């Protein structure tokens, strides 16, 4: 029987939940013996049979964004944890009957991969909300969740985790490919071939998060179609100031979040209009992407960049990145043929966590120490188990 795993993902854009039912024909290979098998065959090595996006109601999104900015007290944070658990269970409901297992990333509201003495923080920490027991109770399925802490306990940054699934599903011999995610935060996975020890991945900086903040100031959920940015002009002094941010000088492995990339922490003239602010944020995001490739990936040899995430549907942002990366080809999941298997810019992250959950069920290590900086790989994810596992996972 073909394993079927339902991945649930709500990213740093906090716009809603992607539920992707990942089918894995041919997994696990015969005789894998509990050790992750060598990759073979064409890509992708899986397909998304069904996908449902459930948007957050405005009041839930506002609460999530407030938690990201440390704007909730302990009682409100506890309420939000259960509210998100209910939302995840509801998002899973249409597809759960077809799944053997559910893998839930949860909603990251705080991620501090390194101690910060300036704030009196002496240890790394991360927090993903969304009570898993609610998902298990309402779907009747085993659930794997809370993937990041195991890597951090092993000395890693707890991110990025998606690159393990990128490697398993998309790595191809003879092709030096990067998969770039433009979610709330921008990150890349560099796949130089089939060897997982050569995979490189890191956060490059903001993705959609600054643009979403500008859009919110304009009374919009996002800069739909990049129209706000297209109506403005880049403010060169502000762009230069932002590009001097010390976070951009940190070499990989590195992870970042909205707590770093927010307008509240970036200087700008008080009279800068919203269209110009959007244009500047777009140019800044594109430059941080291009600079990351130029410094840390292109020197190793790179054939193409395949873009995913909500930012892939922003024409202004995509055009700015394409121009900044030139002459490197920038392609979409549709253009490389993966969308025909249901793997699109919208489903990639949910499918990735579905695969991480599947690997956890197999007992495989599902992290890449080179990308997170951990001392060793771990089998990440916490279980909420039913009395017995489905046949396809046992």
UniProtKB/Swiss-Prot annotation:
Binding site residues for ATP: 11-18
GO biological process, one term: 1,6-anhydro-N-acetyl-beta-muramic acid catabolic process
InterPro entries referenced in this protein's UniProt entry, alphabetically: Anhydro_N_Ac-Mur_kinase, ATPase_NBD
Domain of life: Bacteria
Keywords: ATP-binding, Carbohydrate metabolism, Kinase, Nucleotide-binding, Plasmid, Transferase
Alphabetical list of Pfam families matching this protein: AnmK (PF03702)
Primary enzyme class: transferase
E.C. no: 2.7.1.170
GO MF terms held by the record: ATP binding; kinase activity; phosphotransferase activity, alcohol group as acceptor
Biological or metabolic pathway of the protein: Amino-sugar metabolism; 1,6-anhydro-N-acetylmuramate degradation; Cell wall biogenesis; peptidoglycan recycling
Swiss-Prot/TrEMBL catalytic activity: 1,6-anhydro-N-acetyl-beta-muramate + ATP + H2O = N-acetyl-D-muramate 6-phosphate + ADP + H(+)
Claim: Translocase is one of the keywords in the record: no
NCBIfam families membership: PRK09585.3-5 (NF007150)
Family label: Belongs to the anhydro-N-acetylmuramic acid kinase family.
Function of the molecule: Catalyzes the specific phosphorylation of 1,6-anhydro-N-acetylmuramic acid (anhMurNAc) with the simultaneous cleavage of the 1,6-anhydro ring, generating MurNAc-6-P. Is required for the utilization of anhMurNAc either imported from the medium or derived from its own cell wall murein, and thus plays a role in cell wall recycling.
HAMAP family in alphabetical order: AnhMurNAc_kinase
Name of the protein this chain belongs to: Anhydro-N-acetylmuramic acid kinase
